[in-house]
Amino acid sequence: MHPEEDWLAQVPVGGDAKRNLVASEISGDGDVDAVLADCDEVLEHAYHMRSFNQAMMETFRTYTELDRYGRLHVISSTQIVFHVRRILSRALGIPKSKIRVEKPRIGGGFGAKQTAVSEVYPAFVTLKTGRPAQLIFTREESQIAGSPRHEMEVRVRLGADKDGHIRGLDLYTLSNSGAYGEHGPTTVGLSGHKSIPLYTGGLEAFRFGYDVVYTNTMAAGAYRGYGATQGIFALETSVNELAEKLGIDPTIIREKNMLREGMKMPA
């Protein structure tokens, strides 16, 4: 995965055929470049986090039936009952009021079950036949149909004075959404929105930008940490490298720069 100059997709991967960009944004506060130019120490590194899949104990599974009122009753191992109802309504062409989704206690999810995976197939059978239907995925099927963590490349520019006070942060994330982009625009935001505020203590300026791209790979989705994990790993590693370069205990660096009562967190 790498940025392409014009975001031109070489093969059909959905979305806008003229580019493979799912989402893009730049936000911040202050003149980051000027602050970094005035810092005693500036670190610039890129960190690559690979994609990998969940393995919750209970695989994807759904049972469907028509209740006494003729409504579609869906019992599913899911984390998103109302999203499932909305998705089934659109997929099957029936009103949401005709669908009831029930979530029993599930055997793990870690975010994988924040995607509608097994619900539509038995629901379609029940609507066509009027009979109950059930679908239970094997472990192999769950791995194939699941949604792994987003592969990300996070580039960090960090500026500080010689005493370890972090004055400027510039963070850019390139996120691989895979063939579809349902969680792409939301997970990537957390890579910066959950990491940069940790170092608000003496921060004079910050910038956070991201691009999310379609690629011809498995569609990524929710995975424990939901994008924050990748961003925090990158920034925390940079802070450790700053501490080593300055010869200051990493804990002291964090104490000097942590958010304190009364401060406003950048968002």
Model-flagged regions — what are they?
Residues 1-267:
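Structural alpha/beta core scaffold segments of enzyme domains
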